[in-house]
Amino acid sequence: MPNMLEVYKCVHCGNIVEVMHAGGGDLVCCGEPMKFMKEGTSDGAKEKHVPVIEKTATGYKVKVGSVAHPMEETHWIEWIELIADGRSYTRFLKPGDAPEAEFCIQATEVSAREYCNLHGHWKA
């Protein structure tokens, strides 16, 4: 049974879903159960994939990696998500964008996740 804010991917078509409301049953796509995307389990370099969270005057800035991640047509960060006090905030990126996002919110507990089209799901 999926849990709130877990991310799953279809191994056939590549659809990615995030659980917004946890219910019973399994997530299925293309006739098969979707694969749970555990963070940080690919062979990608950690220094280019683990999100770095910075507190700013207006909220939080999330940069992908301590070394800037490539943002090329064949290799880029698709999205950055900030989870703040149990709420989810997402910015979608495209090739050519900077691998970072700003979130103008105030919170006491934050974590960040991102998805690389080649190296998967990562969390800080």
Curated annotation (Swiss-Prot):
Reaction catalysed by this enzyme: reduced [rubredoxin] + superoxide + 2 H(+) = oxidized [rubredoxin] + H2O2
UniProt keyword Glycosyltransferase, yes or no: no
Cofactor binding description: Binds 1 Fe(3+) ion per subunit. The iron ion 1 is coordinated via 4 cysteine residues.
Pfam families xrefs: Desulfoferrod_N, Desulfoferrodox
Family under the similarity heading: Belongs to the desulfoferrodoxin family.
Domain remark from Swiss-Prot or TrEMBL: Is organized in two protein domains. The N-terminal domain has a fold similar to that of desulforedoxin and contains a mononuclear Fe(3+) ion, center I. The second domain contains a different mononuclear iron center, center II, with a Fe(2+) ion.
Name the UniProt record assigns to this protein: Desulfoferrodoxin
Organism name: Nitratidesulfovibrio vulgaris (strain DSM 19637 / Miyazaki F) (Desulfovibrio vulgaris)
